[in-house]
Amino acid sequence: MGNYRIAVLPGDGIGKEVTSGAVEVLKAVGIRFGHEFTFEYGLIGGAAIDEAGTPLPEETVRLCRESDAVLLGAVGGPKWDDNPPHLRPEKGLLAIRKQLDLYANLRPVVCYDSLVSRSPLKPDLVQGVDFVIVRELTGGIYFGQPSAVVENGEEKAVDTLLYKKEEIERIVRMAFELARGRRKKVTSVDKANVLSSSRLWREVAEEVANEFPDVTLEHMLVDMRMQLIRAPKQFDVIVTENMFGDILSDEASMLSGSLGMLPSASLSASGPSLYEPVHGSAPDIAGMNKANPIAAILSAAMMLRLSFGLTAEAGGRARVWQALALGSGSRLGQRRPHLSTNEMVEEIKAAVLDYTAIAQIMTVYA
């Protein structure tokens, strides 16, 4: 039995719909397992710009800091594309990462058997793919000091890529700890043949590796992104800096066959962590009850496990959605194109509340 306070930041586009679905399933988990979840809502992204004049209001930061975890929908949309840089929705996401010290982003990449046919790659390449990308979130070029100047009539722009040793050390150590519970292999991705920051990254990775003699470390240049397509099953845990991780994780997300199935977690060293689906705001289908809620629901499942330590609840729920969304042929917008967001959520809620269904599902998927 537990009481947990969750800050919900729907954001833009389909963010409201998918977070609403995740909240409904969390309520079902609370009923089924005897937990109490309190949900409080805040603004971020374009919605915050429209209502509060800033992509991240102070009220939202305060709400998040006072909560046990944060559930985010999505930010962005063409409506704000012409805004000045400080009034872009994405600035809200960068700011909340910094404010909460969300230093590590975990993106599981799994291709389930039922989704193999949806992948753009050949089945023999993606069947059995199961790795995690660990991306550093609070350092690097996204948080450097950019500047734009005009000298002698010529426009110039500068972005600074800066990493401290301790920033690298803590993210690499997390990757090794994660790998120790998996297949015991870490692939560190850098650009050490060109960048000084990457040479430091590689040196620190070697130092941390000495603490984990049971885990294998390999280095790859970021040029290795072709390996994600050529031989994705070789990877277990990939760890990399902010910008490289941004690019690699988006590319890797397509291996699964559906962007709408992938969750992510952004972990804090000392405060609440944030959970969000990998997909974007999809403004073209916003409000149409067509959005796939599974990535948001799985993100909430990661919250149960990583922030609250509710392993049984998270694991059981993951099996519920797998059985419904994959095994029974209920994949939203794929096998049953007329299955709405709300219908998918209701199916998963019903299975969570039905003890018999959970027992059967866990037997099949254990």
Curated annotation (Swiss-Prot):
Its cofactor is Mg(2+); Mn(2+). It catalyses: (2R,3S)-3-isopropylmalate + NAD(+) = 4-methyl-2-oxopentanoate + CO2 + NADH. GO terms for molecular function: 3-isopropylmalate dehydrogenase activity; magnesium ion binding; NAD binding. Pfam families: Iso_dh (PF00180). The keyword Metal-binding applies. Its EC number is 1.1.1.85. NAD(+) binds at residues 77-90, 280-292. It is found in: Cytoplasm. The keyword Iron does not apply. Its main location: cytoplasm. GO terms for biological process: L-leucine biosynthetic process. SUPFAM superfamilies: Isocitrate/Isopropylmalate dehydrogenase-like. PANTHER family: 3-ISOPROPYLMALATE DEHYDROGENASE (PTHR42979:SF1). Catalyzes the oxidation of 3-carboxy-2-hydroxy-4-methylpentanoate (3-isopropylmalate) to 3-carboxy-4-methyl-2-oxopentanoate. The product decarboxylates to 4-methyl-2 oxopentanoate. Belongs to the isocitrate and isopropylmalate dehydrogenases family. LeuB type 1 subfamily. NCBIfam families: leuB. Homodimer. This is 3-isopropylmalate dehydrogenase.
